[in-house]
A protein has these predicted regions:
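Intrinsically disordered, low-complexity non-transmembrane regions of multi-pass membrane transporters
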Residues: 1-22, 216-231, 266-270, 280, ...
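Membrane-embedded helical hairpins/re-entrant loop segments and their flanking transmembrane helices
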Residues: 6, 16, 42-80, 247-317, ...
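Hydrophobic, membrane-embedded alpha-helices of multi-pass small-molecule transporters
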Residues: 17-30, 34, 166-178, 195-196, ...
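The first (N-terminal) embedded transmembrane alpha-helix
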Residues: 23-40, 84-91
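Short, non-helical or kinked segments that cap or interrupt transmembrane helices
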Residues: 54, 76-89, 130-139, 192-198, ...
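Membrane-interface helix-loop-helix modules in multi-pass membrane proteins
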Residues: 79-109
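Membrane-embedded alpha-helical modules
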Residues: 98-217, 324, 328-437
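Hydrophobic, small-residue-rich membrane helices and short re-entrant helix-turn-helix hairpins
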Residues: 187-199, 224-233, 242, 259-282, ...
Length: 442
């Protein structure tokens, strides 16, 4: 049985078997989202299957490198917190447009320059931390959870585009997985209780296999080893309009990363100050540069995994570092990736309901420490969450806006976060009370 105190700090080192068991749990939770962007880009560019496979393996490999950079850190790069890294969905639209006009090499040229921009601007962006008092961070954490819930719900239905979406089989599998997670979380002890999501995913997949809903045929068709070749599509080219659009994407990423950082800090009881935030954003920049070199994409924190930390209570950054090692192996050995890919969406959705709901609960807990008397905080929270839900309630609401504006507006997390910051400035001013001074000194 695992000693709970052994896992209740960010710097706790667990036995190797436990590290990789908990690390695998994180990988299974994020895998579907991790491979979605390369699939979408390949489809938009009409790339052959061989190139799609290269994009997926390069993405997984670079996800692992990016996660190791963020969790282990070196020098002033990396936050040294349990933050798993994945490709940002904010980059999909701009990359598709750049690729259609200028080809893959222009995509990677823009990514490399945008990554360098992110690295250089990190210490300046981190000075904005005084704009994130507890009412803003609590609101942003809540918004992150709310905006992730549709992901889990669509997974539970079978995945968008699935002709069997919403079938009794898919929904039943999702709820069964959800119930298994709850049962293990409630009645198992120690180590196994903390593995409730992993056990739910494995049990749900086994049930799906017995029902004929999933199979492992793709494992046999996959190659044993993949080679990650830098600049596979050619040396990068630089179109400055494309570079500018990717820089806008990275500004959005910095806002989202800030929110995710505060969410993780809240859950693992580690204050995120100016220096920590700068290190986290620098890591995003370095990982994005590496992504451009290795035929991958811009990197940021994967909010899906924040909820998993809250569910399991395992706060060790070395667990997520183990996830990084597993992701590297998945990128190098496609047969392993094919096994993970066989987990049905419905099963992922059942686990996702619990994970993403925990992010919402963490945000509410954070807001519970905020005073709503004699100030405008209630209006700030109400409007920020309201505008963040627009893309959820009406996905085409901003369809007639310019492409650059849609990058911001169609992300409920980004627009809701920006709204919370602006409303705090408008309604409360730049509060220089004790809370903000304490954050600014870090």
């Amino acid at each position: 049985m695992t000693d709970q105190k052994q896992m209740n700090t960010v710097d706790s080192m667990l036995p190797i078997p436990q590290l990789f068991a908990f690390g695998l749990q994180h990988v299974l939770a994020m895998y579907a989202g991790a491979v979605a962007v390369p699939i979408i880009v390949a489809q938009a560019m009409n790339l052959p299957m061989e190139d799609l496979i290269r994009l997926i393996t390069a993405d997984l490999f670079t996800c692992g490198i990016a996660t190791l950079i963020q969790t282990l850190g070196f020098g002033k790069i990396g936050g040294r917190i349990p933050m798993i890294q994945g490709v940002t969905f904010a980059s999909v639209g701009p990359m598709a447009m750049i690729g259609a006009q200028h080809g893959m090499t222009a995509i990677y040229g823009a990514i490399i320059i945008a990554g360098l921009f992110t690295f250089l601007i990190a210490p300046f962006f981190s000075r904005l931390i005084r704009l994130f008092p507890p009412v803003v961070t609590g609101t942003i954490i809540t918004i992150i959870g709310i905006n992730l819930m549709p992901v889990a719900i669509n997974w539970m239905g079978g995945g968008i585009g699935n002709p069997q979406f919403g079938s009794f089989t898919n929904i039943g599998l999702g709820f069964l997985t959800f119930l298994i997670v709850i049962f293990v979380y409630k009645f198992a002890k120690g180590f196994f209780s903390n593995l409730s999501v992993l056990i739910g995913l494995i049990a749900g997949t086994a049930i799906a296999f017995a029902m004929g809903v999933t199979n492992f045929d793709e494992v046999g068709r996959s190659h044993w080893i993949a080679f990650i070749e830098p600049f596979y599509f050619g040396l990068p080219t630089f179109d400055w309009a494309s570079v500018l659009s990717m820089i806008i994407v990275m500004l959005v990423v910095m806002v989202e990363t800030t929110g995710d950082s505060f969410a993780i800090g809240e859950i693992v009881d580690k204050p995120i100050g100016r220096q920590e935030l700068a290190s986290i954003i620098r890591a995003d920049g370095v990982s994005t540069i590496i992504g451009g070199i290795l035929n991958s994409f811009p990197y940021t924190a994967f909010a899906q995994n924040v909820g998993l930390i809250a569910v399991t209570g395992v706060k060790s950054r070395f667990v997520v570092a183990a996830s990084g090692v597993i992701l590297i192996l998945l990128g190098l050995f496609p047969k392993l990736a094919a096994i993970v890919a066989s987990i049905p969406n419905a099963v992922l959705g059942g686990a996702g309901i619990a994970m993403f709901g925990m992010i919402v609960a963490s945000g509410i807990r954070s807001l519970g420490k905020v005073s709503f008397e004699g100030n405008h905080n209630l209006m700030l929270v109400a409007i920020s969450i309201g505008v963040a839900m627009i893309p959820i309630a009406a996905p085409n609401f901003y369809a007639n806006f310019p492409a650059w504006a849609q990058i911001i507006l169609k992300s409920g997390i980004t627009f809701g976060s920006i709204m919370a910051i602006l409303l705090n400035l408008l309604l409360n001013g730049v509060n220089r009370g004790d809370e903000i001074k304490e954050m600014g000194r870090r």
